[in-house]
């Protein structure tokens, strides 16, 4: 019988008396009697190595009075429920609704989806059944189902029912229990007098209309999204020069290529758009393709101007003006403030796309989102151009376009790479005399860090992703990781992790969480 000292990651210390012939699994059971960590979640570290359950204490050369470190690991996944095999019908049913995730568990385990359901914006949304019902009616599949089933429409009008459904969606264990109950009910459905009739009505009244509406929508989208390059190409080679992609009148230059010669090009060009103009066009208009917005773009022997009588460019004056400099360009690294892979998964979800477009097209919801986010409200008050842009329905629709958001994410990653490589040192507080640049017109006016903070506060779902949207975001800690994670580094070194660079990298990626950092180091 020897005495082993136990030191947990929470700085709790105690000792146990064990025999050296027992296994590590039995050793964990003894430890579980003196701490709150279950045996299956214990990670015991000795001499920088994690102990395996089948090893004995003799094998690892542990002796009387030695100290081992105890870390709480992740809980093991629950075993899949055992289901009875039911006879499969001869006619095969459709596999699922097009555009809807086939595995709802994977979608609900997405951290971004969980943050969305836990946000105050979702709570306020469920308190107003009218807005929620309007969002559901905006989906053609759900609209057909609700029109054919008044009882379901009445359920969507009850805030209590909606809140109970939300609580179930927030709790993965509760949802799994509900799905197990549904599986058991389906197995025993033949014992219910009206079981098969209920199942038939559920299929004919709910599933079949959803399938029909979704198939029609998917067919129409496939028809409209056909590749125009493939359908319009002919066998003859194209000898025409490619037009300038950054020019606002590229269509006219492509149709008449000779008009772009130096002898025939006018010194002053203007374009008037009486319809809904491209909000991004005037950002790149003017001589030399400047990013000035068409107001102060003075090139060499060429002056460009736009007169948008329709939906004008709300970002023109933000990026325009002579020589303000690229103020706050360092904030582009934190633009959107989220993991690009998770954002990509969210953008590819058609349900999330419809919800986002619905939120952004509702002025009342946009105003509520601005009111609940003090940081966004302050930006609106200090920047009239941004407020005008957020009130522009066409611009909001373009902002919710998955292609545009993917492009913004790629721009974020590119700016982060440039900053990591030292191209943009010190946050790029301003690039001084950038007003000329051969007619580029300057890029002053708007602080990109404000634009990034706005999307960081919105959290990816129109203000719904950030659970702390009602509080002001704390300032970023500028201390080096060695000082910021000093205590965590000492704990890792005591546990036997001597690679300081790897420890700093793990702590930085986990934001100082010692347990997650240990899991990352042990992979």
Swiss-Prot record:
One Pfam assignment: UBQLN1
UniProt KW keywords: Developmental protein, Repeat
Gene Ontology terms: cellular component: cytosol; phagocytic vesicle
Residues annotated as domain Ubiquitin-like: 2-77
Region (Disordered): 70-99, 215-325
Protein name per the record: Ubiquilin
Gene designation: ubqln
Gly residues: bias regions: 285-296
Function: Stable protein which acts as an antagonist of nosA by repressing cellular differentiation after the tight-aggregate stage, when cells differentiate into two precursor cell types, prespore and prestalk cells, prior to the formation of fruiting bodies.
Regions of compositional bias (Low complexity) in chain numbering: 215-227, 245-278, 297-310
Domain UBA, residue spans: 480-523
GO MF, any single term: polyubiquitin modification-dependent protein binding
Gene3D superfamilies: 1.10.260.100, DNA helicase RuvA subunit, C-terminal domain, Phosphatidylinositol 3-kinase Catalytic Subunit, Chain A, domain 1
Biased composition (Polar residues): 228-241
UniProt-listed InterPro entries: STI1_HS-bd, UBA, UBA-like_sf, Ubiquilin, Ubiquitin-like_dom, Ubiquitin-like_domsf, Ubiquitin_dom
STI1 domain ranges (all copies): 100-135, 139-178, 339-380, 383-415
Single GO BP term: ubiquitin-dependent protein catabolic process
């Amino acid at each position: 019988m020897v005495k082993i000292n136990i030191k947990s990651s929470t700085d709790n210390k105690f000792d146990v008396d064990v025999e050296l012939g027992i296994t590590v699994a039995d050793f964990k059971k003894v430890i579980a009697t003196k701490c709150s960590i279950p045996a299956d979640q214990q990670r015991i570290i000795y001499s920088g190595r994690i102990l395996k359950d089948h090893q004995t204490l003799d094998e690892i050369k542990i002796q009387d009075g030695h100290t081992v470190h105890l870390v709480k690991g992740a809980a093991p996944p629950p075993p899949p429920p055992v289901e009875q095999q039911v006879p499969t019908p001869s006619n095969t049913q459709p596999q699922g609704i097009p555009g809807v995730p086939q595995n709802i568990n994977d979608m609900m385990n997405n951290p971004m989806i969980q943050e969305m359901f836990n946000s105050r914006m979702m709570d306020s949304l469920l308190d107003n059944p009218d807005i929620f019902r309007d969002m559901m009616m905006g989906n053609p599949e759900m609209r057909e189902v609700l029109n054919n089933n008044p009882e379901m429409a009445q359920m969507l009008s009850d805030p209590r029912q909606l809140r109970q459904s939300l609580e179930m969606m927030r709790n993965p264990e509760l949802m799994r229990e509900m799905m197990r109950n549904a599986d058991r009910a389906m197995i025993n459905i033949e014992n219910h007098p009206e079981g098969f009739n209920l199942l038939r009505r559920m299929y004919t009244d709910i599933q079949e209309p959803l399938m029909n509406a979704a198939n029609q929508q998917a067919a129409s989208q496939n028809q409209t999204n056909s590749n125009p390059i493939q359908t319009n190409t002919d066998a003859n080679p194209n000898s025409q020069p490619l037009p300038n992609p950054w020019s606002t009148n590229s269509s006219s230059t492509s149709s008449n290529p000779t008009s772009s010669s130096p002898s025939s090009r006018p010194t002053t060009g203007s374009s008037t758009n009486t319809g809904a103009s491209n909000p991004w066009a005037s950002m790149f208009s003017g001589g030399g393709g400047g990013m000035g917005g068409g107001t102060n773009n003075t090139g060499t022997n060429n002056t460009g101007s736009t007169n948008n009588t329709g939906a004008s460019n709300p970002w023109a004056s933000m990026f325009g003006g002579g020589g303000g400099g690229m103020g706050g360009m360092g904030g582009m690294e934190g633009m959107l403030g989220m993991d690009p892979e998770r954002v990509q998964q969210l953008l590819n979800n058609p349900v999330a796309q419809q919800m986002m477009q619905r939120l952004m097209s509702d002025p009342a919801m946009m105003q509520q989102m601005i009111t609940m986010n003090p940081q966004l409200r302050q930006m609106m008050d200090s920047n009239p151009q941004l407020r005008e842009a957020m009130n522009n329905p066409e611009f909001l629709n373009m902002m919710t376009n998955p292609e545009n958001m993917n492009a913004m994410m790629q721009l974020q990653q590119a700016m982060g790479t440039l900053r990591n490589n030292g191209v943009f040192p010190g946050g790029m507080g301003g690039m001084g005399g950038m007003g000329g640049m051969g007619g580029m017109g300057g890029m002053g006016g708007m602080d990109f860090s404000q634009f990034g903070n706005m999307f960081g506060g919105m959290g990816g779902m129109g203000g719904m992703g950030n659970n702390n949207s009602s509080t002001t975001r704390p300032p970023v800690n500028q201390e080096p990781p060695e000082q910021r994670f000093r205590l965590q580094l000492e704990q890792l070194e005591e546990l036997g992790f001597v690679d300081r660079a790897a420890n700093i990298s793990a702590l930085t990626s986990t934001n100082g969480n010692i347990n997650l950092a240990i899991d990352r180091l042990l992979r």
